[in-house]
């Protein structure tokens, strides 16, 4: 399995596979992969003509994403499972969305479980809230504005 570090040279390859991505994670973009790969120690591999990102610790892939591409992801998923079995590492995937887990459950009923990692959760915002920056103001800002108003009387 060739493990590849995202780079400018691999951007076109990433873009090719990521055009088939239908999942919501912002991590599934070539730009984010290039920008964050060193910080999060992420790399990628191509298995069965499918893109699979992986987290690396001490040069060893320790967890993978669900395969992305135009083909059926089952064969690539099976290659990931084989990797863990051959490496004697515990099976681990990250960024598994409900639709992905449903596929895994159809292929291998009851064999895998999913755990929610709140520390890795994305935040959702309403467009209107971001556009108007509506929301509770910091207490110090509120007090400052009240003080300014009284001073101008």
Where on the chain are the PLM-derived regions?
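Conserved small/polar residues in nucleotide/adenosyl-binding loops
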Residues: 142-149
């Amino acid at each position: 399995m060739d493990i590849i570090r995202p780079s400018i040279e691999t951007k076109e390859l990433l873009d090719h596979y990521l055009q088939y991505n239908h999942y919501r994670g912002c991590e599934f973009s070539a730009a984010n992969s290039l920008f964050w790969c060193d910080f999060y120690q992420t790399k990628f591999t191509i298995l069965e003509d499918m893109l699979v990102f992986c987290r690396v610790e001490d040069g060893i892939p320790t967890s993978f994403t669900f395969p992305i591409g135009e083909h059926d992801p089952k064969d690539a998923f099976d290659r990931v499972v084989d990797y863990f079995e051959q490496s004697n590492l515990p099976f681990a995937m990250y960024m598994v969305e409900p639709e992905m887990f449903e596929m895994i459950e159809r292929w291998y009923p009851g064999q895998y479980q999913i755990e929610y990692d709140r520390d890795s959760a994305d935040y959702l915002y309403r467009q209107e809230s971001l556009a108007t920056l509506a929301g509770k103001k910091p207490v110090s800002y509120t007090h400052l504005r009240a003080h300014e108003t009284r001073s101008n009387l």
